[in-house]
Amino acid sequence: MRTKAVIFTGVNKVEIGEVNIPKPGPTEVLVRTIITGISVGTDGWYIKGLYLGGQIRYPTIYGYQRVGLVEEIGSEVVTVNLGDRVFVGTARTRLEPGSRIGDAAGNYTGFGCHDASVIVAIPDGVSNIEASMGGVTATPVVGRNLTDPQQGELVLILGQGMIGQMAAQLYRDKGARVITADILANRVAISQKISADIAINSS
């Protein structure tokens, strides 16, 4: 099937085009996109040609935080049902043979075909916008789990952008005492209100 796509055609160059999405195989799911989260960091670097993962080959379709509805499921899929609202993280969208999208995940498309193992049903009470940020939570979750904070342990988090705020909240959730620092007053204010025990303006 043909679907619309946001295609990065070069550094700071974006076009709306179309790509072919295949029917799902036995273990795959076809997802109709509702929304995709945009990361100021990763997405911003990618469009500027500064992605840290290596050289970018254009044209390419980026996007790695798809929220959508299950439109079709393969014969062996048992984890989701038709109509389920789901999140798809960094998994690459499978395209028809010959549809080149470079090295990116390719979730800036109207539909995506993904293996069921990378699809998570979204619980009731979680909005589409909240769910679309699921991909960026991976960094602070991994960091918190690797450091295994103990109750009352003091933790310093430098930077209070989206990932820093999430990290602070995750550490506090484990019982750590959290100090945050940022050079932007608005981030410090938000951090003091919802993320940190102590928020410092380090400018």
PLM-predicted stretches and their roles:
Residues I16-E18, V67-L69, R85-F87, F111-C113, ...:
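Conserved hydrophobic/aromatic beta-strand scaffold that supports enzyme active sites
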Residues P22-I38, L50-R92, P123-G125:
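Glycine-rich beta-strand-centered segment in the early N-terminal region that forms part
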Residues G10-N12, G25:
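Residue-level recognition of beta-strand termini and adjacent short loop/turns
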Residues V40-K48:
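Cytochrome P450 core scaffold surrounding the K-helix E-X-X-R motif
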Residues S127-S203:
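Mid-domain Rossmann-like dinucleotide-binding core that forms the NAD(H)/NADP(H) cofactor-binding site
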Residues R2-K4:
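Extreme N-terminal starter segment of soluble prokaryotic enzymes
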Residues Q65, T109, G175:
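Short coil/loop residues immediately preceding or within conserved phosphate-binding loops
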Residues G89-L158:
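NAD(P)H dinucleotide-binding glycine-rich loop of Rossmann-like/cofactor-binding domains
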